Amino acid sequence: MNTDWNSPQGDFDTAEKQGELLMLLSRQQVTVHTWDDPDFDYMEEQDLALVVQSPSGTEDLLIELCGEFSVFFEKWHGEYAATAEDYAQLQQDITAILDGKAGALSLYTENGWQGTVLCTELPGAEDATAAAALKRCWQEAKPDTVLPAGSRLELVCWDPAQNRKYQLPEE
């Protein structure tokens, strides 16, 4: 078992994909960071971070290339092994977020934040069943997590005009 979490965790070294990812992000404003940048001093010397700056000045997208790939958007965090299959999913998820086809869906209850999932079934602004669509998205990602009555779902998207908040009805 490999216990060095900063060494490649799959078929290739994540740093090998930096150029491909920068091409994928070529329409965006991206900054590249290493372990010697003050905000990234938690990383190992060989690690890289790509920060995709939000054009609206709200939530940036952070992509870390360490022993595996990690993506952070709002409160959502996705992890992807350095395998062809996971790398393809990483590209798909990043593209969906940036194209406004996915967002970070968070659940809040009386006990506070309960978790966040990547929601790829975004309701339209006039969608009468938007709350149902978001509830379904949450339940598909976390089928064992109950959505208590009175809890709140918050969807954060790359384009803040798509953001939504829904209070689940009290029973």
Q: How would you label these PLM feature ranges?
A:
Residues 48, 57-59, 74-82:
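Short secondary-structure capping micro-motifs at structural edges
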